[in-house]
Curated annotation (Swiss-Prot):
Protein name (record): WPP domain-containing protein 1
InterPro entries: WPP1/2/3, WPP_dom, WPP_sf
Source species: Arabidopsis thaliana
Keyword DNA-binding (UniProt): no
Gene that produces this protein: WPP1
Region (WPP): 28-131
Protein backbone atom coordinates (compact mmCIF):
# COMPACT_ATOMS: atom_id res chain seq x y z
CA UNK A 1 0.00 0.00 0.00
CA UNK A 2 1.10 3.46 -0.65
CA UNK A 3 2.05 5.54 2.21
CA UNK A 4 0.56 8.99 2.38
CA UNK A 5 2.22 11.87 3.97
CA UNK A 6 0.20 14.18 6.02
CA UNK A 7 1.23 17.76 6.25
CA UNK A 8 -0.04 19.92 8.94
CA UNK A 9 0.12 23.66 8.47
CA UNK A 10 -0.32 25.82 11.45
CA UNK A 11 -1.17 29.46 10.98
CA UNK A 12 -1.01 32.10 13.57
CA UNK A 13 -1.98 35.75 13.44
CA UNK A 14 0.86 38.23 13.47
CA UNK A 15 1.14 40.37 16.53
CA UNK A 16 -0.95 43.54 16.31
CA UNK A 17 0.90 46.56 14.93
CA UNK A 18 0.70 49.63 17.04
CA UNK A 19 -0.60 52.81 15.43
CA UNK A 20 2.79 54.49 15.57
CA UNK A 21 4.40 51.65 13.61
CA UNK A 22 1.77 51.68 10.88
CA UNK A 23 3.41 53.26 7.83
CA UNK A 24 0.17 54.01 6.02
CA UNK A 25 -1.28 56.22 8.73
CA UNK A 26 0.22 59.56 9.62
CA UNK A 27 -0.08 60.64 13.20
CA UNK A 28 -2.80 63.22 13.59
CA UNK A 29 -0.66 65.63 15.56
CA UNK A 30 1.88 65.81 12.70
CA UNK A 31 -0.88 66.32 10.14
CA UNK A 32 -2.32 69.16 12.14
CA UNK A 33 1.05 70.88 12.45
CA UNK A 34 1.94 70.69 8.76
CA UNK A 35 -1.04 69.76 6.58
CA UNK A 36 0.89 69.75 3.29
CA UNK A 37 4.62 69.44 3.93
CA UNK A 38 5.64 69.24 0.25
CA UNK A 39 3.94 72.37 -1.08
CA UNK A 40 6.09 74.11 -3.66
CA UNK A 41 5.28 77.67 -4.56
CA UNK A 42 6.66 79.13 -7.77
CA UNK A 43 6.30 82.84 -8.42
CA UNK A 44 7.29 84.38 -11.72
CA UNK A 45 6.78 87.99 -10.65
CA UNK A 46 8.80 90.02 -10.06
CA UNK A 47 11.45 88.93 -12.54
CA UNK A 48 15.06 88.81 -11.45
CA UNK A 49 17.46 91.52 -12.58
CA UNK A 50 19.10 88.92 -14.84
CA UNK A 51 15.75 88.33 -16.57
CA UNK A 52 15.12 92.06 -16.92
CA UNK A 53 18.59 92.51 -18.45
CA UNK A 54 17.86 89.69 -20.91
CA UNK A 55 14.63 91.45 -21.92
CA UNK A 56 16.54 94.70 -22.48
CA UNK A 57 19.20 92.92 -24.58
CA UNK A 58 16.52 91.29 -26.70
CA UNK A 59 14.81 94.66 -27.20
CA UNK A 60 18.12 96.23 -28.27
CA UNK A 61 18.65 93.42 -30.76
CA UNK A 62 15.12 93.74 -32.14
CA UNK A 63 15.33 97.52 -32.46
CA UNK A 64 18.83 97.73 -33.97
CA UNK A 65 19.11 94.71 -36.28
CA UNK A 66 17.06 93.44 -39.17
CA UNK A 67 13.68 92.24 -37.97
CA UNK A 68 10.05 92.38 -38.99
CA UNK A 69 9.82 95.80 -37.35
CA UNK A 70 12.93 97.16 -39.06
CA UNK A 71 11.67 96.05 -42.47
CA UNK A 72 8.54 98.11 -41.97
CA UNK A 73 9.69 101.01 -39.80
CA UNK A 74 13.49 101.03 -40.05
CA UNK A 75 16.04 100.22 -37.37
CA UNK A 76 17.69 102.32 -34.68
CA UNK A 77 21.39 102.88 -34.08
CA UNK A 78 22.82 100.69 -31.30
CA UNK A 79 23.19 103.51 -28.76
CA UNK A 80 19.70 104.83 -29.41
CA UNK A 81 18.26 101.31 -29.33
CA UNK A 82 19.95 100.75 -25.97
CA UNK A 83 18.45 103.86 -24.35
CA UNK A 84 15.03 103.21 -25.90
CA UNK A 85 15.09 99.57 -24.77
CA UNK A 86 15.97 100.54 -21.19
CA UNK A 87 13.18 103.10 -21.00
CA UNK A 88 10.67 100.66 -22.55
CA UNK A 89 11.54 97.99 -20.00
CA UNK A 90 11.56 100.41 -17.05
CA UNK A 91 8.17 101.87 -17.96
CA UNK A 92 6.64 98.44 -18.60
CA UNK A 93 8.01 97.14 -15.30
CA UNK A 94 6.63 100.12 -13.37
CA UNK A 95 3.17 99.77 -14.94
CA UNK A 96 3.05 96.00 -14.42
CA UNK A 97 4.24 96.31 -10.82
CA UNK A 98 1.50 98.83 -10.08
CA UNK A 99 -1.13 96.53 -11.57
CA UNK A 100 -3.04 94.53 -8.98
CA UNK A 101 -4.11 91.00 -9.84
CA UNK A 102 -5.49 88.31 -7.58
CA UNK A 103 -3.27 85.49 -8.82
CA UNK A 104 -0.59 84.20 -6.52
CA UNK A 105 2.07 83.22 -9.04
CA UNK A 106 2.23 86.47 -11.04
CA UNK A 107 1.18 85.16 -14.45
CA UNK A 108 -1.32 87.98 -15.05
CA UNK A 109 1.24 90.60 -14.04
CA UNK A 110 3.78 89.01 -16.39
CA UNK A 111 1.21 89.20 -19.21
CA UNK A 112 0.66 92.91 -18.49
CA UNK A 113 4.45 93.47 -18.49
CA UNK A 114 4.86 91.68 -21.81
CA UNK A 115 1.94 93.54 -23.37
CA UNK A 116 3.35 96.91 -22.25
CA UNK A 117 6.76 96.08 -23.71
CA UNK A 118 5.23 95.13 -27.06
CA UNK A 119 3.02 98.22 -27.14
CA UNK A 120 5.85 100.60 -26.24
CA UNK A 121 8.29 99.00 -28.67
CA UNK A 122 5.81 99.43 -31.51
CA UNK A 123 5.11 103.04 -30.48
CA UNK A 124 8.85 103.77 -30.42
CA UNK A 125 9.57 102.47 -33.90
CA UNK A 126 6.46 104.14 -35.32
CA UNK A 127 7.47 107.48 -33.78
CA UNK A 128 11.01 107.12 -35.15
CA UNK A 129 9.62 106.22 -38.57
CA UNK A 130 7.35 109.29 -38.60
CA UNK A 131 10.25 111.58 -37.65
CA UNK A 132 12.52 110.04 -40.30
CA UNK A 133 9.95 110.37 -43.07
CA UNK A 134 7.43 113.19 -42.61
CA UNK A 135 3.94 112.64 -44.01
CA UNK A 136 3.59 113.26 -47.76
CA UNK A 137 2.48 116.71 -48.94
CA UNK A 138 -0.67 117.32 -50.98
CA UNK A 139 -0.46 115.83 -54.43
CA UNK A 140 1.90 112.98 -53.58
CA UNK A 141 1.32 110.03 -51.34
CA UNK A 142 -1.44 107.84 -50.04
CA UNK A 143 -3.40 110.52 -48.18
CA UNK A 144 -4.00 112.59 -51.30
CA UNK A 145 -4.93 109.48 -53.32
CA UNK A 146 -7.50 108.49 -50.70
CA UNK A 147 -8.83 112.06 -50.55
CA UNK A 148 -9.24 112.18 -54.33
CA UNK A 149 -11.19 108.90 -54.31
CA UNK A 150 -13.51 110.27 -51.65
CA UNK A 151 -13.97 113.53 -53.59
CA UNK A 152 -14.73 111.70 -56.85
CA UNK A 153 -17.24 109.37 -55.19
CA UNK A 154 -19.13 112.34 -53.70
CA UNK A 155 -19.52 114.02 -57.12
Amino acid sequence: MAETETESITTSSPPPISETENSTTLPTTETEKNPNPVTISLRIWPPTQKTRDAVINRLIETLSTESILSKRFGSLESEEASSVAKSIEDEAYAIASATVFGDDDGIEILKAYSKEISKRMLESVKAKSNVASPPPKDGDGIESAVDSKIDSSEA
